[in-house]
Amino acid sequence: MSPLLKSIIDIIEIFNQYASHDCDGAVLKKKDLKILLDREFGAVLQRPHDPETVDVMLELLDRDSDGLVGFDEFCLLIFKLAQAAYYALGQASGLDEEKRSHGEGKGRLLQNRRQEDQRRFELRDRQFEDEPERRRWQKQEQERELAEEEEQRKKRERFEQHYSRQYRDKEQRLQRQELEERRAEEEQLRRRKGRDAEEFIEEEQLRRREQQELKRELREEEQQRRERREQHERALQEEEEQLLRQRRWREEPREQQQLRRELEEIREREQRLEQEERREQQLRREQRLEQEERREQQLRRELEEIREREQRLEQEERREQRLEQEERREQQLKRELEEIREREQRLEQEERREQLLAEEVREQARERGESLTRRWQRQLESEAGARQSKVYSRPRRQEEQSLRQDQERRQRQERERELEEQARRQQQWQAEEESERRRQRLSARPSLRERQLRAEERQEQEQRFREEEEQRRERRQELQFLEEEEQLQRRERAQQLQEEDSFQEDRERRRRQQEQRPGQTWRWQLQEEAQRRRHTLYAKPGQQEQLREEEELQREKRRQEREREYREEEKLQREEDEKRRRQERERQYRELEELRQEEQLRDRKLREEEQLLQEREEERLRRQERERKLREEEQLLRQEEQELRQERERKLREEEQLLRREEQELRQERERKLREEEQLLQEREEERLRRQERARKLREEEQLLRQEEQELRQERERKLREEEQLLRREEQLLRQERDRKLREEEQLLQESEEERLRRQEREQQLRRERDRKFREEEQLLQEREEERLRRQERERKLREEEQLLQEREEERLRRQERERKLREEEQLLQEREEERLRRQERERKLREEEQLLRQEEQELRQERARKLREEEQLLRQEEQELRQERDRKLREEEQLLRQEEQELRQERDRKLREEEQLLQESEEERLRRQERERKLREEEQLLRREEQELRRERARKLREEEQLLQEREEERLRRQERARKLREEEQLLRREEQELRQERDRKFREEEQLLQEREEERLRRQERDRKFREEERQLRRQELEEQFRQERDRKFRLEEQIRQEKEEKQLRRQERDRKFREEEQQRRRQEREQQLRRERDRKFREEEQLLQEREEERLRRQERARKLREEEQLLRREEQLLRQERDRKFREEEQLLQESEEERLRRQERERKLREEEQLLQEREEERLRRQERARKLREEEQLLRQEEQELRQERARKLREEEQLLRQEEQELRQERDRKFREEEQLLRREEQELRRERDRKFREEEQLLQEREEERLRRQERARKLREEEEQLLFEEQEEQRLRQERDRRYRAEEQFAREEKSRRLERELRQEEEQRRRRERERKFREEQLRRQQEEEQRRRQLRERQFREDQSRRQVLEPGTRQFARVPVRSSPLYEYIQEQRSQYRP
């Protein structure tokens, strides 16, 4: 490789080594330039560490003024330094020797080649000296060879450039990848502080090794390419040389051929030497490259560590510098504003002083003057001066107005920048939180997804970093532009002040000259008049005519002289006016140019903002796409879970089908026995009829009891508060009595059945026992079915509650989303608060004051937080009471179900223990039943656990929400406390107070209307809930639009404040605003709205207190009615349960028979665990018996029955053991026959069941007739049902009350937002009106200025006419005047045109 290419590659590598790689490409920042100058040019520069050196170099190199140094600008630095170095070396004495010594080692081969070429051409010249044709041929040959060599050289250079470019691109790509990977590694290391650090380090080491291997392979490939290229070049050179030799051999004589052969041999030797040297150089290069690679790796490692440290330090320094710069800028802007104000005040004071001096001078001039003409002159001059001061004061006013406008524009730009930065940071934090959430969601997913997410996060972070850099760059440029504008404005102001001073001096000088000139002219006129009078007195009449002619000539001359002087003065005045106008035009042109530039800058910024918005929109769309994918994945997971649920349910259904089959088999077996025992069925029907008769009697008793309870309830309504507990006790006693009667009747039935069974034979006893067991099993199945239906009802209710909870969860999620945004804002504020605290650590006094303020704020916050916590605690207590009430009801229902289940289990177990030794099949069936019940209990336990977990989860989420609300409320109170100090001063303004009063009155009226419409709102609430989501979306859009509108409104308000409020109060407010603007500029709008909301909430709470006092009685009445309705509902439920039991028994007997057959299969599975569960059940029964005091009598009766049953068992056991073998044999035969007679028995059973159903339907119709006869009772039931429905509606209302309160809060929030929007629209209208008024005012001022100019022109024209007319009148008057002193006594004072002109001017300016 040539030294030139090597030096170029070294320059490129050095640049890439120190450059920062962004989206704009590789550029040198100020810090990078500092490091480069320190390390690479430390020996050349005098002071490389000095920041001024870096600033000077940056200003010299940064041609495009973007604060960054590109590669072309870096090359400019290299060329300048090289030029300076060569110039310094050329000045030295030993430059040639150094060059020779330096070139001897490198260019030895080239010198030998040149010497050989010279020898060869000298021989050729000697041979062809006398032959001109040979010379010409030689020249042509040389030119051709040179051209071919040039082409080959160009090819080689192009080839080398191509490969060097490829190599450079690869190196840059690798460096970029390294940088990106380093950044990604840093970020990942930061994120992974505590998790999988060792695995991450190992992965990173593997990745680095892979990268190093890739680099090494790339270098090897590059080296192989270079070798191939060199071989190819050598082959090309050899081929070309062979072709050249062949041509020369053909054309040259033998002697020359010999010479050429010798030369070629010499060249071949040289080439061999060159090849050997190249190989040696290549080996050295390879060794050097390996050493350099090792060094580079070490350096890179060290540099990586250094860069990591430096980056951390840089980030901290940048933050501190940014904060300090912002503080400095703010202080500088503040100082500049104060200086501008002071200058304006000084200018105004100087103008006042000048005016006072001018007035004093004029007064002195007036006092000095004695003649009337001087007074008239002074009056004219004073009026002209007033007009001129008006004319010249206008530019000054315009200048002040332009300064204010510039200041306002600057403040607007600063606010816009701050808001944009806040919005950008907010979006950035939102994106970071979203990425964090995605990472948390996908933490359990495959590593490929993690890599994709990491890559996306890396790209997003790089993009954010680039955007921050661009925004910083733009901010620096804007600040530079603003500083330049301010400097230009200062220069223009100084220039204008100088011009005004010079103009005032010229005006004063002219005024003095004019004051002196009239006195001289009048003295000269007086002398002439005296001479003329003397001549007229003593001259002859002929001479008088001559004298008159001479006087006329003199008058004409004087008039011409005055006119000439007047024209000269007018010409000077015009020139000055034109000069002034030209300056004004130039200034206006410059201002227009500046405005155009500003507009161009604004347009460019707007375009950039639009581009940023588009990019953000694209990012948002990408984010939405990612979220959509995540939602799809979650949906897939839900579908999988649903499929699993369906699979589980399918298995359960299959198990139930198996149980049904078993029960069906059992039923078939029983049906075969039932056909043999038709008589027993008849007896059973009689027993069933008796039971129905008993049930009818019980219903009649219950109806009587209900009537009594209704009467008691009516009595209770009158004395509800005093007798609530008594009524509950009476109801409990009544229920206990009713239950006791039912149990006694059941016991009597059982005793009658047992007596009847004892009377009959043992075979009939066994059959009856089996039938009784069958009936009991049917009853158990019916009860289980009822229990299953109740469970389904509970599950349905639970699903409805879950659906409600899901809706609430969605609302909570939306609330969490809003709260998350608020938390993000609060996090922003917290970070700013931390930065502010770090700043305040340096300022001890401010910290102490702020600590005091914080303590006061904290006390206020604690007080408010305490009140809010009390309110929230009350709400929580209400919610908790509602939950407890609901849970209590569920627990009561569950307890009732458990008691029923336990009683059923006890009865079943008792009977199973009696027949334990008699029937093994019955034991197996019982075991299967217990197994199924165990599974059901386990499922119920699982359901209960799930419900408990859901409740705990809900409670935990509610606690978290409440905690978040508390934190948010505390933070909001802090913000409110901070904003309160600012708002106290703003509320002092009368206009805002009046508007707020009007707005409050209007809001108060609207809230009264809202309170009246609340009942109507309750009916529309369901429809409103459906539209709530759509409204939220629209609200989000409107919030974005409102943000822009509010930003615009805020700008207009600030402009209006700046225009209207010029007093010290506003300056103090602006100073305070500036202190708080860094932290609360974006929140000010929200806090204002929150203040209005708090004010409205306070009034609303006061109104609500009044309304609550009115509604307390209504609520108490509702509470009484609710309790009555609850009692009636319980009674109605009991009635309904009895009715449902009766109806369900008639409808579902067939289904229960099938399920009894299915249950037989389950019983076979339960046989294995019978004994263990029996022991557990016995223990539970003992505990339950100990607990249940009210069932003591029942247990005693059961013990008696058990003793009797035990005696019966002993008697039975003796005979059953004998019959057991027979039964087993029969069962085996029956099992064989069962498969054969399955369908026949099933058909017979169906027929019998149909007959039974008909009988039941007939009896059911009879009972319906009885029910129709009791229409009054039904009406009362309907009345109770209506009351219970109202009660249910009230319960629903109470359950929805919490939701309504939330919706009411949301509605209030929306109403407040609507109120804020209306207020903003009113403010906009007011501001538009003000703008319209200002525009009209400006139009009036413009018209007034035009009118003034027109009047000035007319006045000038009128003055000319007056002067001409006055001149003519003077001439005529002088001709008419007679000689004598009487001429001066009749001076025209009242009738002069000058006096008329003065009077006209006075009338114009008179108020």
From Swiss-Prot:
Q: Which PROSITE patterns match?
A: EF_HAND_1 (PS00018), EF_HAND_2 (PS50222), S100_CABP (PS00303)
Tell me the tissue specificity: Found in the hard keratinizing tissues such as the inner root sheath (IRS) of hair follicles and medulla, and in the filiform papillae of dorsal tongue epithelium.
Name of a matching Pfam family: S_100
The segments labelled S-100-like in the record are 1-91
| Entry annotated with the keyword Cell wall biogenesis/degradation | no
* Binding locations of Ca(2+) 1: D32
Positions of Ca(2+) 2 binding = D62, D64, D66, E73
**Is Cell wall biogenesis/degradation one of the keywords?**
no
Q: Which InterPro entries match?
A: EF-hand-dom_pair, EF_Hand_1_Ca_BS, EF_hand_dom, S-100_dom, S100/CaBP7/8-like_CS, S100_Ca-bd_sub, TCHH
Any single GO molecular-function term of the entry would be: transition metal ion binding
What does the record give as the function of this protein? Intermediate filament-associated protein that associates in regular arrays with keratin intermediate filaments (KIF) of the inner root sheath cells of the hair follicle and the granular layer of the epidermis. It later becomes cross-linked to KIF by isodipeptide bonds. It may serve as scaffold protein, together with involucrin, in the organization of the cell envelope or even anchor the cell envelope to the KIF network. It may be involved in its own calcium-dependent postsynthetic processing during terminal differentiation.
Entry's free-text remark on domains? Consists of nine domains. Domain 1 contains two EF-hand calcium-binding domains. Domains 2-4, 6, and 8 are almost entirely alpha-helical, configured as a series of peptide repeats of varying regularity, and are thought to form a single-stranded alpha-helical rod stabilized by ionic interactions. Domain 6 is the most regular and may bind KIF directly by ionic interactions. Domains 5 and 7 are less well organized and may induce folds in the molecule. Domain 9 contains the C-terminus, conserved among different species.
What is the name listed in the Swiss-Prot or TrEMBL entry for this protein? Trichohyalin
